[in-house]
UniProtKB/Swiss-Prot annotation:
Name of the protein this chain belongs to: Putative pyruvate, phosphate dikinase regulatory protein
Keyword Nucleotide-binding carried by entry: yes
Enzyme class, spelled out: transferase
Residues that hold ADP according to the record: G151, I152, S153, R154, T155, S156, K157, T158
Amino acid sequence: MEKIKIIVASDSIGETAELVARAGISQFNPKQCKNELLRYPYIESFEDVDEVIQVAKDTNAIIVYTLIKPEMKQYMSEKVAEFQLKSVDIMGPLMDLLSASVEEKPYNEPGIVHRLDDAYFKKIDAIEFAVKYDDGKDPKGLPKADIVLLGISRTSKTPLSQYLAHKSYKVMNVPIVPEVTPPDGLYDINPKKCIALKISEEKLNRIRKERLKQLGLGDTARYATEARIQEELNYFEEIVSEIGCPVIDVSQKAIEETANDIIHYIEQNKSK
């Protein structure tokens, strides 16, 4: 049997659409009905919808969506029809029926149900955010983030992002690499929400050589040479100086300790 590909799209977390999709999949023999589910949370623009449409076209996927804002729902409906894609609007028909029954218009606010347990769902939002904007994947996350972590490779950016997300902070991390120009938006946001992660040359050299060993590669690869590391550190210092953000040395710190330092700084500077 051909693998079933499902795209879950939502202007909130996407949990409702995913639960419905998985409930549907569970009604088929799992040994025969292989499936692949991709979640696209926080659909906020027509460009986000276009991305979902393109993936569905490329993979022949079914789109299962819960879009609350009328303009986003309409745009998705039009694009699905235009490209003759397979889709299910989970919320639309129910919202229309409820609206007709009570003779009132809905609030059309994505994620309103999550206010039933604001603290819990704030954490879920933050975790989803950290995944979506990990490793500088999408610069659109910069103005939305509570914290932006900057650092070269092997400075624990991703684990720190996830740890802080479990504390309900929306964190985006941006790798600083000489060959890649930092996103323009990095210079537009408040530098007080940026944290640069510094590491000593010696510690980074050891970490990278160990990483190469794990991959079955020799420790003479350019990735772990002193010249390459110094080049990256110099570039890092240059970018951090331009942004004007604080620097935390993570060379001798556990992730929890670094995270606590970050939280302390962010909370102190919230109102400034």
